């Protein structure tokens, strides 16, 4: 049987790191998108189009990573709730 030595509060705190990281990535993407819009006004031609094409492909990978971070956040929160429920059930089994 596994021994759980982490508290639900610790798990929820750790889960927050994942969602905060996702939010930081969102902010970085917004900055880059804004920069791309500015550059697009001045940089014309095939080189810029190639850059945008590559950026859009890589952007999809970043979005997948963001989804992963959000998923891990949800899983950690769900597990924290499960640990808390199990602990409460165990406490009730002693009849105090």
UniProtKB/Swiss-Prot annotation:
Protein family (similarity comment): Belongs to the WXG100 family. sagEsxA-like subfamily.
Coiled-coil regions listed in the entry: 9-86
Protein name: Uncharacterized protein CA_C3713
Keyword line: Coiled coil
Organism: Clostridium acetobutylicum (strain ATCC 824 / DSM 792 / JCM 1419 / IAM 19013 / LMG 5710 / NBRC 13948 / NRRL B-527 / VKM B-1787 / 2291 / W)
Protein's UniProt keywords contain Coiled coil: yes
Domain of life, per lineage: Bacteria
Pfam families membership: WXG100
Keyword ATP-binding carried by entry: no
